[in-house]
Each structure stands twice: as structure tokens, then as C-alpha cells.
Amino acid sequence: MVQSGQITFYTHMYSPYCHRVHIALEEVQADYKAVTINVMEWPQWYNTKVNPITRKIPAITYGGPAAPPEDPSPEAVKLTESMVIVEFLADLFPGKLRPSDPVQLAYARLFVALFDTKVHEAFKGFFFMGTPASDLLDQLEGIQARLPETGFAVGEFSIADVAAAPFLARIMLLLENDIGKYPVGEGKKAFEELQKPKFARLMKYIADIKARSSFRASYDHAQVLFIWQNNPAIQRA
Ligand SMILES: N[C@@H](CCC(=O)N[C@@H](CS)C(=O)NCC(=O)O)C(=O)O
């Protein structure tokens, strides 16, 4: 299959889940229109007309006749859940994002699952609840242990890296700037820990991700920093 209809991508720069879809759209070089959702004044039309299932971003509409983003055609396919959309894009653009070898594909999906469970839990714990950094660092060490000596998570760039990149970028950004509910200084301390030789492979992986054109096209460091600095959910009391 190839893209045969319009793609409207509902997103916001702060969201790591939206960022996954953005990276995938850039990787496959889809023809798409991005629509930023005002997360401070969540639009009712989004919940009723685009994503009544989870009412979360990201979402896409695919196909159907031309229509304004806030009133998509009933004929357009509506999809939500970041990795469902990423896998859909991998189907629309065969040969990209998925390794052809079934074992490597299974490993890629396992990597995604680790991010959606353990890394995400540790991310929420440290930045949103102020739990000790050790759990986050342990999870990052576990991720590092799964990486091959060189290249991306399963060699070629794949769905695994699409899933991981937004979280790794935000983890580094938040730590370096000491943003989060943990005690002052704990973020910078964890950031320094990650600069030690022990984490060299993970840091190289993150550098490779950030150098990728799909990442550069989908990430504005200053803007994401500003948004997270002002995110009320992770401000210290
Ligand atoms: N499992 C979902 C998570 C999506 C998600 O949590 N989106 C957040 C933004 S990062 C959201 O829309 N939050 C708004 C809300 O919960 O009202 C995915 O993979 O897409």
C-alpha cells in the first residue's frame, strides 16, 4: 500500500507521544498537515469529531474528501495511540521503519514495550512524583544493555527508535535543566552520571537519534524546553 489520501496530524510539541508520530511521518516522507491542539483550552470538537475514543493526542485522520481539521469528513479514517499510528505508517510505506527479519522485528517491538512500560513508569516517577533517580538510571542502563555495539536499537532505524527518541530527548533535556518534582540538583546529578563512561553507548545512541533528519525536523529544543519549564504538572511545590 502507499499513501493514497490526505493525512491530518493532531499534535502538540510538548508531547513525547505526538513526537513519535511526527518522527515517523518525516521518516516515511508522508504528505501531511500538522494541526497543533491548544492543550490549555482543549477543543471540544477534537473530543467529538477526531478522537472520541481516548480524547488524547496524537491522532490522525486519513483519506476522505478535503475538510477543515476541526470538522473532518466522516469518511476519513481516524486513528489514535502513537504506536498504532506509527505501525499504520509502516504499512502505508512498506520497506521503511520495520526490519524485514521477524526476529529483529520482534526485538524492535520488545524495545517499544519496554519504553511504554518500564521507562515510562520511571519517567513519570522521577519527573512527576519526585521518586529517587536510581530507578530511572536503572531503566536507562537496561535499555543500553539491549543496544547493539553500533547503530540503532535493532541496527537500521526502526519503530523501536521512533518510540524511544522522544522520551530519551526529553529525559536528557529535563535532567540537564533540573526540571521536575525531585529535590533541586538531583536532575543535574543524574545528568552528570549519564556522562560517565558507563553510559557511553546510550549517549552515542541518543546523539545518533538527534542527528537524524526526521528528529531534527520534528524537534525544536528551545520550544520544548520552554513548554516543560512551564508545565504545571512537574513544578516543585
Ligand atoms: N498511549 C497514548 C498516550 C497519549 C497521551 O497520553 N497523550 C497525552 C499527551 S502526551 C494527552 O493527550 N493528554 C491529554 C489528556 O489526558 O487529557 C499514545 O501512545 O498515544
In which residue ranges do the predicted regions lie?
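GST-like fold's C-terminal all-alpha helical module
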Residues: 103, 110-211
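Short, flexible loop/turn segments with low-complexity composition
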Residues: 102, 217-226
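Acidic, serine/threonine- and proline-rich low-complexity regulatory tracts
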Residues: 201, 205-214, 224, 229, ...
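Active-site-flanking alpha-helical
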Residues: 90, 167-168, 219
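GST-like domain detector, emphasizing the conserved glutathione-binding G-site
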Residues: 1-144, 148-149
